[in-house]
Swiss-Prot record, chain A:
This is Putative glutathione S-transferase alpha-2. Belongs to the GST superfamily. Alpha family. Keywords: Acetylation, Transferase. The gene is gsta2-1. It holds the Pfam family GST_C_3. It catalyses: RX + glutathione = an S-substituted glutathione + a halide anion + H(+). One of its GO terms (molecular function) is glutathione transferase activity.
Curated annotation (Swiss-Prot), chain B:
It comes from Dictyostelium discoideum (Social amoeba). One of its GO terms (biological process) is glutathione metabolic process. The gene is gsta5. Glutathione binds at residues 8, 42, 49-50, 62-63. The lineage of its organism: Eukaryota, Amoebozoa, Evosea, Eumycetozoa, Dictyostelia. Residues 2-78 form the GST N-terminal domain. This is Putative glutathione S-transferase alpha-5.
Length: 198, 198
């Protein structure tokens, strides 16, 4: 277990659900300890409320559920929008990616995935074309989530029907990707992360 | 102030979570029951999905985002950032339980239900909630109840109704269920809600 004074994020070596918070912490320039494991040992399992990773530790404060971790960090660093309404508009996008898009990879059905991408990424693209940001008038966790989700599907390749998410079809989301990847912290993280299968 | 409106199908499904919350908090609201999603309604839906929560010009979808928004309005999310994050961590778990059950509960025969209860993918969540409640009075680990205690009741009530309660003993969750079932604020809704099997 980490004894460091900086927060730690524990997840498998792959990108998966750990990616959202890793990219977020890197983008916000928050130092953190990136702990990777190959399996959940009994000792680790005993500390996990639902037997699942990722887990985030900040001193004595322990948190699981990737969307909860990301929202907690974002809220702490004013990255959830400018007011209450914006916070919950961000939340609905974060929830959509976690609850609707990610589970679809478990049993991928090409026709279903295609429709799913059109429905969600189509709506994100439209919003970005209209206002430049997914929520409000500045970048928020919602934009970062859409970038990470989009990028992750492309990384997963044809098993995840990645060819559906082309720059031509989603030019504004592709711009979002460029925006985040030009951030110093994110660029450093991407350069250093290991090549993995998931 | 405008009375909020919740739009959903004539079943319990996802909408029972925000409905129970509004009932418990004593907030008047309109329930707009629809059999199908009309073209007009579809245009208002960010991801073409229900439930939809509307309050004046403010519209929000995704059940957890709706729950969080209502709770914030009523100061029912927890006192500190940490408490709110712990509540959200539990809510994310509750939504995973809901997703497991909603997907195929009404397609199961008695034998499949029995198998589900014994090898339940939701068991780890019930054990996690039970553990938190055996160490703390409330799920967010604060000194007062928050929305997530009520949401845990709705989860247990729903899973019981579907005949999918995982095997094992959950005295704290059962006690939580009894507590909210006897709540005068919920009585009317619990008696008049749709008798649907999902």
């Amino acid at each position: 277990m980490s004894t460091s004074s900086v927060p730690s994020l524990t997840y498998f070596q792959g990108r998966g659900l750990g990616q959202f918070s890793r990219v977020l912490l890197s983008y916000l320039g928050i130092p953190y300890e990136n702990i990777t494991v190959t399996e959940i040992s009994d000792a680790l399992r005993a500390t996990l409320p639902y037997g699942q990773l990722p887990i985030y530790r900040d001193g004595d404060f322990v948190l699981t559920q990737s969307s909860t971790i990301a929202r907690y960090i974002a809220k702490k660093h004013n990255f959830m929008g400018k007011n209450l309404e914006e916070e919950f508009l961000v939340d609905q996008i974060v929830t959509a990616i976690h609850a609707d898009i990610f589970p679809a990879f478990n049993n991928p059905v090409p026709e279903k995935l295609q429709k799913l991408y059109e429905k969600y990424f189509g709506s994100f693209e439209k919003k970005l074309q209209e206002t430049g940001f997914l929520v409000g008038s500045s970048v928020t966790l919602a934009d970062l989530y859409v970038y990470v989700g989009f990028d992750y599907i492309r990384f997963r390749g044809e098993a995840a029907l990645s060819s559906e998410l082309s720059d031509e079809k989603y030019p504004k989301i592709a711009e979002l990707k460029k925006f985040f990847e030009s951030n110093e912290g994110v660029a450093k993280y991407i350069k250093e992360r290991p090549e993995t299968k998931f | 102030m405008t009375k909020p409106t919740l739009t959903y199908f004539p079943v319990r499904g996802r909408v029972q979570f925000p409905r129970c919350l509004l009932e418990y908090l004593g907030e008047e609201y309109n329930f707009n029951e629809v059999k199908t999603i009309s073209d007009d309604l579809r245009k208002q839906l960010l991801f073409k999905q229900l439930p939809l929560y509307q309050e004046g010009d403010f519209k929000i979808v995704q059940t957890p985002a709706i729950i969080d928004y209502i709770s914030e309005k009523h100061d029912f999310r927890g006192k500190t950032k940490e408490e709110r994050a712990r509540a959200h961590q539990c809510l994310a778990g509750i939504m995973e339980v809901l997703d497991h059950c909603l997907g195929y509960s009404f397609k199961m025969d008695k034998q499949q239900q029995e198998k589900f209860r014994n090898e339940s993918p939701i068991k780890k969540f019930f054990e996690g909630f039970e553990m938190v409640l055996s160490q703390n009075k409330y799920l967010a680990s604060g000194e007062k109840e928050t929305y997530v205690d009520l949401m845990a009741f709705v989860m247990v009530d729903y899973v019981t109704n579907l005949g999918l309660m995982p095997s094992g003993d959950y005295p704290k969750l059962i006690s939580l269920k009894k507590h909210y079932e006897s709540s005068p604020q919920l009585k009317k809704y619990l008696e008049s809600r749709p008798q649907s099997n999902f």
